């Protein structure tokens, strides 16, 4: 998505696995890395409560900055709304820093496209 100009990636989840703390721990490991590696804002949320099939969803919501830092989060097991000010200047600061913006240095010539797999 970054290759196509994405600055914000929205990641809605409907994952019943784990409790709010386990979900948050997993997200901190994976989503902060995705934001950092791609120099984008990540906005993620998970369904909360039980659905008609009896699956219980632990909730969770967070916004991560392009440097991988958590800007705002809510790990409480209840419905909520988060507000975050996503500033273009924050995105530019990371993307203009030679030691923090790795995307331009990738080497797609060293690997083939997933679409080329048979």
Predicted features by range, described:
Residues 1-81:
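CN hydrolase (nitrilase-like) catalytic-core segments centered on the catalytic cysteine
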Residues 3, 91-118:
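Cysteine/selenocysteine-centered motifs that mediate thiol-based redox chemistry or coordinate metal-sulfur cofactors
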Residues 78-96:
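A short, polar/charged loop-to-alpha-helix boundary motif
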């Amino acid at each position: 998505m970054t290759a196509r100009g994405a600055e914000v990636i929205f990641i809605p989840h409907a994952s019943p696995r784990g409790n709010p703390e386990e979900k948050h721990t997993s997200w901190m490991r994976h989503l902060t890395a995705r934001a950092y590696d791609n120099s984008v804002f990540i906005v993620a949320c998970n369904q909360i409560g039980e659905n008609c099939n009896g699956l219980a969803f632990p909730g969770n919501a967070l916004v991560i900055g392009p440097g991988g830092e958590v800007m705002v989060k809510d790990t409480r097991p209840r419905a909520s709304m988060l507000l975050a000010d996503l500033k273009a200047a924050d995105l530019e600061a990371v993307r203009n820093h030679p030691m923090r913006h790795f995307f331009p240095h990738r080497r797609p010539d060293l690997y083939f496209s997933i679409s080329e797999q048979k």
